[in-house]
Amino acid sequence: MMRSLALVLAACGSVIAAAPASADWRSQYRELGFGVIPVETQTQAMASFEAFIPYASQKLGVPVRLFTASDFIGVNNALIAKQIHFAWSSSSAMAGSWLECRCVEPIVAALDKDGNLGYNAVLIVRADSPFQTVDDLKGKIVARTEPNSQSGFLVPTIEFAKMGKPVDRFFNSPVSGGHTQSVLGVLNGTYDAAFTWTTRGDGYGQIRTMIDKGMLRRDQIRVIWESDLVPAPPVIVHRDMPADLKETLIEFFVNLHRDRPDLARAVAHGETQGFVRVDLTKYESTIESRRMLRDARRRGG
């Protein structure tokens, strides 16, 4: 009888051991959609990820499709609707989506070239402009990007209010629609200044991307205000994503810099020491800032 019981248990063990293979996420997902916003144009975004997409498809074992939208909320909405499966987002957009649906979460983010997990919002002016300080810009045209941008909207809105210089009152502050538009607007004189993002030494971020694309020379602009370090833009997924798929994506990104540093650089938009695992706790301050901004708007403040 003991021998029969052992055989039964062995058979059950075989079934259990085989279960993960039969339940592998690839049996549910014939392809994966990866969402990004174009730093330049949609055509250039496709070119920037030309090598990443086939590499990701090979490593993940299913075709990966690139999805682009004009802003972060478009990318996040596609993720929430499960039209795509993972996305490069802004911390602020992720926090805003989380407050609305509690259905998205960050899985990895890129370190900068010095190993910092974050970046700085900056206020830039033309190098040949007369503006030297924030106070010099009172009443001037100072662009923010769009409401779901961490560095281009949320951080300056919150931080300048704390300084007693609310952006909407201290400046004339139009919304440019994106970081590229903001920087180009400063260069061509449309804006006196604009908020954007970078890391120490411009290792990655908007300034580095535009320098690498030949759209900007570093000596054309000056930074006259810089925020404290804010959480790095995360790669996000839907919270009900199967755990094995989530772990596969995390492993893929964590190993990307080791295996293909050129592709890690493309995803991070500049120099990086690689991607590391993150979770919602890393973004608690951003979520709280979005909550404060949302509540102030509801009060009409």
List the predicted regions and their residue ranges.
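Pocket-lining segment of extracytoplasmic ligand-binding domains
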Residues: 129, 141-244
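Boundary at the C-terminal end of the N-terminal hydrophobic targeting segment
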Residues: 17-23
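Bacterial N-terminal signal peptides
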Residues: 6-17
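Short loop->beta-strand "edge-of-pocket" segments that line small-molecule binding or catalytic clefts
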Residues: 32-39, 136-152
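Short helices/loops that flank or line small-molecule/ion binding pockets
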Residues: 73-87, 100-101, 119, 135, ...
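Acidic, polar ligand-binding/catalytic clefts
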Residues: 77-136, 157
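An extracytoplasmic/periplasmic, membrane-proximal ligand-sensing/linker region
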Residues: 25-51, 237, 241-301
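Extracytoplasmic small-molecule ligand-binding "clamshell" domains
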Residues: 23-95
